[in-house]
Each structure stands twice: as C-alpha cells, then as structure tokens.
C-alpha cells in the first residue's frame, strides 16, 4: 500500500512535459509531518523577508573553502614542487586550466546537492536533499555500484604493492590520500620542533580529532578555522615568493602559453591535473552544501547556486595563487645559475622534507620555518576535509549506521597505521619514500575521475534529478567537452605509457605477452565502463515538481516566478559530526 501511495505521489507531481505518466522509478526520502508555512500565504512585502545581499551570501560561505583544501594538500604541494623543479614555469597553464575546470565541475556538484530531492507546494510530506554518492547508490544497479567500489580498492592496492604497507585497508577515494596528508604534517612538526617523524604522525592523528571536535559547537566555527588555515598558507607561500622574486614575464608565459617540452612533461602535467581534480572532492562538495538551510523555491535555489559559485570561485582563486607561488618558488630556486651541486641533487629528487632544506640553504633559516608553518596548515586542514569526504562516501554508498564519532576514530587510526609503521622503521627517509609513492597515486586518481565525473555530469543535466535547475545547454556542452577531454587524455596516456613500457622493459618476451594478455583486456573494460556510464539512461526520479493539475504552479516553477518559501528541513546528519559527551 505504501508503494502505491508513493507512486501516486510521483504521478501527481510529474511535470507536464512528461504527458502525465512515466515508467521511471521515483527515489524519495519522505519524512512525514506537518508542512512548514509557506511565504506565499503571507504578505510578500513583509519587511522581515530576507532579500539577496551580503548577509544572505555570508550564510552560504564555508563549503568552498573546505573543498579548496583538496587543491592545497601536501601531496598536491609536492607535485607542484616537482613540476617547478623539473620544468620551471612551463606547467603553470595546467594549473590555470585545471582550476577553471575545477570551478565548473565543483559548481555542478554544489548545484546537484542544492537542487536534488526537492518538493513543491501542496505536498503533505518533505523530501530531503541527496548528495552524489547517495544518488549513485539509488541510480545504478548493484553490480555497477560494487564495481565502482572495487575500482577504488584497486587504486588502494596499487599503493600497497610497492612498499608492502597496509594502506589497502583504507577505504575509498578519501582514505588513499591520508598517507601523505599525515606525513606532510609530521614533516612540518619535524622541521619546526625537531621531533621524530613518528611522533609527528601520532600528534597529527590526535590533533585532527580535536579539531573535528570544534564542529560539536557549530559547523561555522570549523569552517572559520579552515578559512584561517587557507589564508595562513597563502601568506606563507607568498612570503617565500618574495624571497626568490621570480620573473613576472616568465610566470605569465607559463600561465598562458601551453607547452609540454622536456622529458616527463606529459606525465607531470597529468599528475598535476590528477592532483587538482580529485574524485572524492565531487562527493564532498555535493554533501557539504546540504548542511545549509535554504528555501525550496526556484528563486531561492537559484540564489543559493549563485552564492555557492561565487564563494567557490573566490576559494579556488586563492588556491590557484598558492599553487602558482609554490611552482614559482621551486622553479626559480632550482634553475638559479649559482645553485650548488648538492642543492641541484635535491632539486632532482625533490620531496616535502628535502624542499625545506633546499629553501634553508638557498634562502635562509627563516624561509624554511615559513615553509614548515604552511605545510603544517596544509596537512591539518587536509586531514579534516579528507575525514569529511570519507564519511559522506561511506554513508552514501554503504549506508553505514555506525555512530559518527566511532567511524571518525576508526578511520583516523587506520589512516595513521601505514605512516606510523614506515616512519618508525625508516625515519624521515622512509616517510619520504612513502610520500613519493603517494604522489604516484595522483595519476591513479586521475584515471578514476571518470567514475565520479560522468555520474555528476549526467545527474546535473537531468530533468529527473534537477528539474528546472538542470544545466543550460551551454554548460552541458562545456562541461562534457572538458570531461571527455580529460578522460581522453587519461586513456591516451594510459595506453601509450603501457605500450612504451612493454617495448623498453627488460622482461623476457613470454613475460611481456603474459602481461599484455592481462592488461589490454582491463584497458578495454575501462573504456567500456566509461562508455556505459556515459550513455546509460537515468531511471530514478529525485525531483518532484508542483501538481500537474495546477497550471499556475507549473508556470511558477518553470519560469522562476514562485514566491520564497519557508526554510525546509535540512540534512542534520551532514551538518554535524557529534563526538561523545
């Protein structure tokens, strides 16, 4: 009976363009209760009605800064350092294009969370918003859903093979990042206070849990802390750039003249792109916006999407400037005419820890301390957002019912384990080798990107998911061109890189044939999986419009003429991470 009533609710709310019927599946999280009062029952000239402005905009500020930290984590900074050391400023254009692309994609993720799971007037129930991982779980059949999960596990295992560490226990996109986030902070503590790296790893895990405890007193306080850490990083790296004084002309050329010269430039460019556009960030952003209470009207949703776009744009602009500063510092120092042979060797194998000594030798001890403070801010803030992303992904795909503070504690302990073991056994050099391996994972993340990006592009362009808030034709064209472009680059580099390795390695022919028999079918499956996700039709409805029998409501929704409504119930499970009393 409940299923019949739910289907009747769907039939009564289908847009007129569906001709009164649909064979699609409706996925709704219905919360019964008294509907909230509607503003259209009140005086529209009510002076207490909140109009668009700075105060309203500031109520939406926060998610963009949390998301921007994925572009400023220690692994990203190390990739920047290596790109600058190897290619000077030539790859700055990759950072610029990547962050423009990231802004477009992140805005789609925010819009998806804001716009899905909505309901309009004359419904006696409420439908809460859904984020990307929940939509994927509702949309795809079980075998596809578990294949997506297994792809992430393969990436984790790939990190496990070279060093034999236990990072294969870490779950999904976010947790494969924790290794270098923890090590980055531990390096910073080692530089600042000369404590062993393994002690720094333990301090990092404890401090992350304490910082997450701030959210017990309100999500805004934690978001404010994250924003402060971002600006601390910006101040530190711009301070570094003031030491080296890079050529403004060369920097501008690197930003606006695409160039891939020198050995390994293509691989470094893909690593940079993989470091900038991370799959877990798409899941994170679509969930973070649901922590805000927002109107449930076309006009209110449009305002929210616009505010989130502006906020994300500002946060990503700061992230771009920080990445630019890191590459400029590394490129200038390592290409200096008077560079000693010892420092030249460091430039050839630059890591987060060796970079501090390089800066100290070339620019002085104060420069090394500034770098360490920036690295500390990067590591701490990134571990926080990584924990968020892991919780949202696990909640969406697996519907884990574990209490959040317990899940938070367990995931932090698991994340600390590989870093702690390696840092105890190998010290700073062992931890350095671990973070080099973690940097290789940036390319694996780039290969995994289609399996988060394609669902996002499809859902955000779908009337069944977004209603009148779906992407415009211009955004659809631009986003799909960008998405297919990076997917094509990934497939090309994967194919040519593997073929080149087969030709140049010293394995016997039988071994090469055996490897080819295994790998080429996997590459074909990868391409077929991308094609499947691209062309599969969506079947689950999450946007319920106004009653089809009310032409006025239809016109109000489609034209954005409906008045503002009272704030609707929001995702309290996403708005806080309660810790034990």
From Swiss-Prot:
The protein's name in its UniProt record: Metal transporter Nramp7.1
GO BP terms in the entry: iron ion transmembrane transport; manganese ion transport
Chain residue ranges for the region called Disordered: 551-581
Gene Ontology MF, one: cadmium ion transmembrane transporter activity
Biased amino acid composition, Basic and acidic residues: 564-574
NCBIfam families attached to this UniProt entry: nramp (TIGR01197), Nramp_1 (NF037982)
Pfam families (alphabetical): Nramp
Topology in membrane: Multi-pass membrane protein
Family label: Belongs to the NRAMP (TC 2.A.55) family.
PANTHER family named among the record's database cross-references: METAL TRANSPORTER NRAMP5, SOLUTE CARRIER PROTEIN FAMILY 11 MEMBER
Chain positions carrying an annotated carbohydrate: 11, 19, 338
The keyword Protease is assigned to this record: no
GO cellular component terms listed in the entry, alphabetical order: plasma membrane
Function description: Probable divalent metal transporter.
Transmembrane parts of this sequence: 57-77, 90-110, 146-166, 181-201, 224-244, 270-290, 307-327, 370-390, 409-429, 434-454, 473-493, 513-533
Keyword set, alphabetical order: Glycoprotein, Ion transport, Membrane, Transmembrane, Transmembrane helix, Transport
InterPro entries: NRAMP_fam (IPR001046)
Subcellular location per the Swiss-Prot or TrEMBL entry: Membrane
